[in-house]
Every structure is written in C-alpha cells, then in structure tokens.
Amino acid sequence: MKRLPVIPTIVVGLAIAIMVALGVWQLQRKAEKEKMIAQYAANITRPEIAFPSDPIDDALLFRKAVGRCRAPLSWRQRSGRDAAGGTGWRQIAQCRSGAAGPGMIVQLGLSPQPGGKPAWNGGTVRGYISHAPDDQPLILSLIGMARPKTLMLVAETPVGGLAANPVPDLSSVPNNHLAYAVQWFLFAGIAGIIYTIAVRRRMASPPPPAPPSS
C-alpha cells in the first residue's frame, strides 16, 4: 500500500487552516460592521463638528462637519449619483486646509460630463463625512491588509452649477463579511475534497511493475 504523501498533505492542510481562519475572521468582522452601522445611523443626527485634521477615523462617517478649504490644489472626477438619483461625475477637490497636515478632500457636487473643473477657489464647506474614492484591490480587504480609507467632506450645497450631492445613505456601507466568510469556507471545503480525491486515486492505483530480472 502506498504511503500518504507527507509534504503535500502538510501544505494543503496549512492552506485549508488559513482559509478557515479567514472565514472565522470575516464572521467577527460582520459583527463589528453591524455595530459600526448602528453608530453611523446615530452620527447622522449628532451635532456638527470640525472636519478632523487626521482624516482616517471611520467612527466619524456620516457625521455633520464643517471645514475650510484655503485653496483647491487638484481635482479628480469619479462616477456617481446626485441627490435626485441621476448619474454624473463627482467633482472632488484636494484642498489645502492649513499650514500643516494632510489637507482636506471635498466633494462639491456632480457634473453631467467628465473633465474640466468647477470655478471655485475655496472657502468654508459644510456637509457630512464620507469616504474618499479608494482604488485598493478588493483582495486586500478579503485578507485584512487594506490600509485605512481617507475621509472626505461631502458638501451639502453644490457650487458652480453642479448638481447636489446625495444625502447620507447607510445602504452605501457594504456589509459583505458573511458572503466573504462563506467564500473562504467553500474554498477550504473544495480544496479538502479535491485533495482527498487525488490522494485516494494515487493510493488506489496499482504499483508500477517490477523491472524484469536479468
């Protein structure tokens, strides 16, 4: 009878253990996200605060805030929806907010077409706190290696003829951790089944014939 392949079995076992651990971690993240969403719902009704100088605290999402953009340094556009549900291009400014610090990101409204920039030179902005656009790969979130997302201020009053930004919407906060957990558990189960079938076939196959004696 053939022996169980030791090294491949250890490698596959470790891979399965890692996938199961990631699934359990996603279930823990699901409970944490549910608590955060409840906090975001409360944030909508809380008093206005100054936009944070260190804009990476997710506990402030959906909180009313005010900040001063001394000057827009650069602009970028991202697709999105306006307050009426129409599609457009979000006009997002990277602002200088003071002598030091990371500055402030402000979404000033939506334009019907990409390109160009609003005729706006800065000023006081009131609105609510949201996440700035983020281009990190999804896989980093799945394995818990994503960097903290930067916050931005979504203006309540559009400028320069732009369409109004949407109001705070809790449905925009994804809580996909259960789906991610199921995926990891499925990956672990499939890997275990495939390896078990491969090992059984290997061990059940007849041994090669002995070489003829001379």
Segments predicted by a language model, with ranges:
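Surface-exposed, charge/polar-rich loops and edge strands
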Residues: 1-214
